[in-house]
Swiss-Prot record:
Protein name: Oxaloacetate tautomerase Fahd2a, mitochondrial
Entry annotated with the keyword Transmembrane helix: no
EC number, as in UniProt: 5.3.2.2
Modification N6-acetyllysine occurs at: K202, K233
Major localization class: mitochondrion
Protein family membership: Belongs to the FAH family.
GO cellular component: mitochondrion
Physiological role: Tautomerase that converts enol-oxaloacetate, a strong inhibitor of succinate dehydrogenase, to the physiological keto form of oxaloacetate. It is thereby required to maximize aerobic respiration efficiency by preventing succinate dehydrogenase inhibition.
Residues annotated with N6-succinyllysine modification: K202
Cofactor-binding details, from the entry: Requires a divalent metal cation for activity.
A GO term for molecular function: metal ion binding
Entry's Gene Ontology BP terms: oxaloacetate metabolic process
Amino acid sequence: MLGFGRRRLFSALLQVQKRPCQPSRNMRLVQFQAPHLEEPHLGLESGVGGGVVDLNAFDSTLPKTMVQFLEQGETTLSVARRALATQLPVIPRSQVTFLAPVTRPDKVICVGLNYADHCQEQNVRVPKSPIIFSKFSSSIVGPYDEIILPPESKEVDWEVEMAVVIGKKGKHIKATDVMAHVAGFTVAHDVSARDWQMRNGKQWLLGKTFDTFCPLGPALVTKDTIADPHNLKICCRVNGEVVQSSNTNQMVFKTEYLIAWVSQFVTLYPGDLLLTGTPPGVGMFRKPPVFLKKGDEVQCEIEELGVIINKVV
């Protein structure tokens, strides 16, 4: 399994100790903070669980948010590729705080019942077309941030998901053209208040969009890095126990179909997120049902993408 990293609090160090190191050949874009920086920067994660190369230090003309970086397309990606090929100082992982790789996107689009084995555990039919809902972008937090249990809910559940990050604006995108509009992939946790999914006329939004209900990260792994995003192991652990374990090959509707479908209705913008559904093993379908409680630790992991670890408070 992939190695696990943990969020580090800011230290009292006055200067960041850096060591030269060749970054990973795979492009793993991150947003991060460090004690010596006045504001968040963009960086390259030096492999899963590795330190960070500061892209803004490499080229001060680069934007400092991922959405702006993606909006500039090939211009900024070419700079990141140059940095990837250069031996640059790496800030140790212990000295950085990872933010969500994308913050405040225009849209967070989600897909329900998109794993065949998840449909089986509910004894429901596989959908004939995608079931689309959303989360507000205010629900996004970093890969090692805390999940806050809202006092309004007693049934907060886990859902590991692969998220697709849009890299190019598009509307009415053909399935054959979809990947030209995709920047890459990341790990998402679609935290869900089941009781609120069943209220409010059974509109799912309120149950999905409490603050901190969308941990994301640790990196935006560019599409050229992943040989087949629809053949990746995906799992979730609660307090070390595996509760979800499947493969993205179980998706009913793959990335190309989903984005083509959604783009019929809305224009997609750089930084938009598409959460592609969760596999079986969620708490509400256990007998008896199990829900998250204070003190729990949830690890969501996807092969090649990494792991996010969030404590419940």
